[in-house]
UniProtKB/Swiss-Prot annotation:
Record family assignment: Belongs to the universal ribosomal protein uS2 family.
Origin organism lineage: Eukaryota, Viridiplantae, Streptophyta, Mesostigmatophyceae, Mesostigmatales
NCBIfam families for this protein: rpsB_bact (TIGR01011)
Highest taxon, organism lineage: Eukaryota
Subcellular location: Plastid, Chloroplast
Keywords: Chloroplast, Plastid, Ribonucleoprotein, Ribosomal protein
Protein name as annotated: Small ribosomal subunit protein uS2c
GO cellular component terms, A-Z: chloroplast; mitochondrial small ribosomal subunit
GO biological process, one term: translation
Molecular function GO labels: structural constituent of ribosome
Organism: Mesostigma viride (Green alga)
HAMAP family: Ribosomal_uS2_B (MF_00291_B)
Gene name tied to this protein: rps2
């Protein structure tokens, strides 16, 4: 696996944290200074921890483990979906519904409903129903597809969860902790790195930063899956 260079990370703005007044003191060991009231992340540590996370994912993928990518903010949404699909993994990129993992049996029922409605749509059955009934089912289909399409092929709880924006996805983080599912999280200067099994200190707001790091994590999974 090709490692990420410090210059490449700087160009992507990985080192830019949040305003100093909004920091989490638990991130102090990953911060090397500040500029104009913005904390700057130590990219040497980012590179090291990204490499550790990639090694972990590569080995897990080699063993046939399942992965879930989570990132619902607008800057991350498209990246999460495309990189998860490339890594033959699952994703949540619109909204974390409470109990997505801790109440998996209920979510599985909703996924079955989604598949059933998609089949009915494909076969043209929805168009043969009375107008009101068809409208209700089409609304259901739209909503289920929006929130659950990235989980359609997930038969069991994931073995590893990759998270962009720990603060925003705190409910996902808590569910993983409760179930003992390891997490890899991009942690900005306002996050708590102790909540992640493998934290990666990084700018979790800039599209280029998110894209660079998530694509590297997906690369590790992709390569691990192809080891004979």
């Amino acid at each position: 696996m090709k490692s990420v260079g410090l210059e490449e990370m700087m160009e992507a703005g990985v080192h830019f944290g949040h305003q100093t007044r909004g920091w989490n003191p638990k991130m102090s060991s990953y911060i090397y200074g500040n500029r104009n009231g913005i904390h700057l992340i130590d990219l040497v540590q980012t590179a090291r921890l990204l490499s550790e996370a990639c090694d972990f994912l590569f080995n897990a993928a080699k063993e046939g483990k399942e992965f879930l990518f989570v990132g619902t903010k607008s800057q991350a949404s498209d990246i999460i979906a495309s990189e998860a699909l490339r890594a033959e993994s699952h994703y949540v990129n619109q909204r974390w519904l409470g109990g997505m993992l801790t109440n998996w049996s209920t979510i599985k029922t909703r996924i079955r409903k989604l598949k059933d409605l998609e089949q009915k749509e494909k076969n043209g059955i929805l168009d043969t129903l009375p107008k009101k009934e068809a409208a209700v089912l089409k609304r259901q289909l739209y909503k289920l597809r929006k929130y659950l399409s990235g989980l359609q092929d997930m038969k069991y709880l994931p073995d590893v969860v990759i998270i962009v924006d720990q603060k925003r996805e705190i409910n996902a983080v808590k569910e993983c902790i409760k179930l003992g599912i390891p997490t890899i999280s991009l942690v900005d200067t306002n996050c708590d790195p102790t909540l992640a099994d493998l934290p990666i200190p990084a700018n979790d707001d800039a599209i280029r930063s998110i894209n660079l790091l998530v694509s590297k994590l997906a690369d590790a999974i992709y390569e691990g899956q192809r080891v004979k």
